[in-house]
Amino acid sequence: MAIKKYKPTSNGRRGMTVLDFSEITTDQPEKSLLAPLKKKAGRNNQGKITVRHQGGGHKRQYRIIDFKRDKDGIPGRVATIEYDPNRSANIALINYADGEKRYIIAPKNLKVGMEIMSGPDADIKIGNALPLENIPVGTLVHNIELKPGRGGQLVRAAGTSAQVLGKEGKYVIVRLASGEVRMILGKCRATVGEVGNEQHELVNIGKAGRARWLGIRPTVRGSVMNPVDHPHGGGEGKAPIGRKSPMTPWGKPTLGYKTRKKKNKSDKFIIRRRKK
């Protein structure tokens, strides 16, 4: 998809960019694969804010996505490429030979009419899902499982991909989109190809109102708060933060401070840490 730019007819339009949605083939989602989506506004079951800067936004319906890709041996044909308001990637509606319909994350270069397959015997072709142990070294993949049968959890955002680097016993070595190199069980499934809609990261929201449509609320700087609200708060005028390093609102060091557990169980699977 290409990026569309606007002329600076107003301060909000100046610099604003949007995707042209040229790859989208329909604006009518499959009703049987929709579910209601209640707004949480960043609150947990106690009503406490656990994720800041969320709330409002346009009403959405959830699209039920097939992350497991467990429909083995039954060919499916791509019916539509659709927009999904709940993720950065586009989604593809697949009509299977037995009559079932499922949504999958749309890989780059997947077109309407193409055929896809799942299972250990599937070809190494864009959109096909198979165990990592059956995928050749050097192949780009996405929607990777961490536990067989759980469904894809890694590399699902627009424009991302991971690469199979090697095989070692029952594990496959994969370089993730973050640059981290880790071992994943060979029985875990992945989908061949890169995630589509790679232009997503180039979009400039342009104005505050558009961010509110997306459910993003304002981010207030700690230095303009009161001391009771933030470690950076207080002072007369534009005061320095008065601390050795920047802090979170809860008094923890931030901007480069490592928060990962020192003895994380998954450390043994990580060969090289991600890039900063």
Swiss-Prot record:
Keywords: Ribonucleoprotein, Ribosomal protein, RNA-binding, rRNA-binding
Any Pfam family: Ribosomal_L2
Positions of disulphide bridges: none
Top-rank lineage group of the source organism: Bacteria
GO cellular component terms, semicolon-separated: large ribosomal subunit
InterPro entries: NA-bd_OB-fold, Rib_uL2_dom2, Ribosomal_uL2, Ribosomal_uL2_bac/org-type, Ribosomal_uL2_C, Ribosomal_uL2_CS, Ribosomal_uL2_dom3, Ribosomal_uL2_RNA-bd_dom
SUPFAM superfamilies: Nucleic acid-binding proteins, Translation proteins SH3-like domain
GO-annotated molecular function: rRNA binding; structural constituent of ribosome; transferase activity
Positions of the UniProt region annotated as Disordered: 224-276
SMART domains: Ribosomal_L2, Ribosomal_L2_C
Start-end of Basic residues biased regions: 258-276
GO terms for biological process, alphabetical: cytoplasmic translation
Function: One of the primary rRNA binding proteins. Required for association of the 30S and 50S subunits to form the 70S ribosome, for tRNA binding and peptide bond formation. It has been suggested to have peptidyltransferase activity; this is somewhat controversial. Makes several contacts with the 16S rRNA in the 70S ribosome.
Entry similarity comment: Belongs to the universal ribosomal protein uL2 family.
Binding partners and assembly: Part of the 50S ribosomal subunit. Forms a bridge to the 30S subunit in the 70S ribosome.
Protein name in UniProt: Large ribosomal subunit protein uL2
